[in-house]
Curated annotation (Swiss-Prot):
Protein name: Octanoyltransferase LipM
Similarity field: Belongs to the octanoyltransferase LipM family.
Species, as recorded: Exiguobacterium sibiricum (strain DSM 17290 / CCUG 55495 / CIP 109462 / JCM 13490 / 255-15)
GO MF annotations, alphabetized: lipoyl(octanoyl) transferase activity
BPL/LPL catalytic domain segment(s): 32-247
Main EC class the enzyme belongs to: transferase
GO terms under biological process: lipoate biosynthetic process; protein modification process
Reported function: Catalyzes the transfer of endogenously produced octanoic acid from octanoyl-acyl-carrier-protein onto the lipoyl domain of GcvH, an intermediate carrier during protein lipoylation.
Active site residues per record: 149
Chain positions of site Lowers pKa of active site Cys: 164
């Protein structure tokens, strides 16, 4: 495995630009322009990302999110919707054929998520891998009851007890692995569930109550307010420990920024975000 990676931090960027950078990095890494990359980012304004195959018109209350000023963006990765507000988001981009990268999605997911797990441990939070054990848990993954990502933990996601602490997804494209994930520092459950369509308010309240037992934010686990920078530094250390890595900073050149801006237009478009 390549032991020297690059690290990139891009704070307070719009949703379309955040997704464009992740997609652009697939090309940059695939062409050998940059080394395998660990990226940390945040969102301004807050945004709602939906999974690549998710039916946004079926799940998302468009009128409500527009009234709240929450833009939507469709990810390259699968899974369900995530409201990105007070959080740290991470992404990892590396060649699929790089030595040491498992061939299966589940095992590579476990390898990369180990860096996040160790990062939580550096913050004093004993998170562990979640593996669905019961038939009920496995059925819940096959047929989700909710459009909300944090409603259930998949294989090798991170949890404290039965409560999910981070939501991640992975895709392989053009010979490159992209895994990105949301690490909420706090969650506004009222606003989160306002984003989705339900048959009635009773169902909305029922799903909100269910969510409280299925997910937990970092500040609640830490018992204090944890900053983006503190989490970022802990996760860098976590990846250094988990994969025996060193990091050097990544800065894009003007040509790379032009490619990112071109991709961002797709992520701002009605066609990409809603008509799929």
């Amino acid at each position: 495995m390549i032991r020297e990676w690059q690290v990139l931090t891009t704070e307070r960027m719009e949703p379309a630009l955040n997704m464009a950078i992740d997609e652009a990095l697939i090309g940059f890494v695939g062409r050998g322009e940059v080394a395998p990359t660990l990226r940390f980012y945040s969102w301004e304004p807050r945004g709602l990302s939906v999974g690549h195959f998710q039916r946004a018109t079926k799940d998302i209350d468009r009128n409500r999110i527009e009234a709240l000023g929450i833009p939507i963006v469709r990810r390259m990765t699968g899974g369900r919707a995530v409201l990105h507000a007070d959080e740290l988001t991470y992404s990892v981009i590396l060649p699929e054929q790089m030595e040491g990268v498992p061939k299966t999605v589940i095992e590579s997911y476990r390898m990369l998520t180990e860096g996040i797990r160790k990062g939580y441990h550096h913050l004093g939070i004993p998170v562990e891998f979640s593996v669905p054990m019961t038939e009920e848990e496995k059925e819940e993954l096959r047929k989700p009851k909710s459009a909300v990502c944090f409603d259930a933990a998949s294989y090798y996601e991170l949890a404290v007890g039965k409560r999910k602490v981070a939501g991640s997804a992975q895709v392989r494209h053009q010979g490159v692995v992209l895994q990105h994930g949301s690490v909420p520092l706090s969650v506004d459950e009222g606003e989160l569930f306002d984003c989705f369509l339900y048959e009635d308010e009773t169902m909305r309240e029922r799903m909100k109550a269910r969510f409280a037992g299925k997910a937990v934010a970092l500040n609640e686990l830490a018992g204090r307010s944890v900053s983006f920078e503190e989490v970022r530094l802990a996760f860098v250390k976590g990846f250094e420990d988990a994969l025996q890595l060193t990091f050097r900073p990544l800065e894009f050149n003007s040509t790379q920024w032009q490619e990112i801006e071109r991709l961002a237009e797709k992520y701002r478009s009605e066609e990409w975000n809603w008509k799929r």
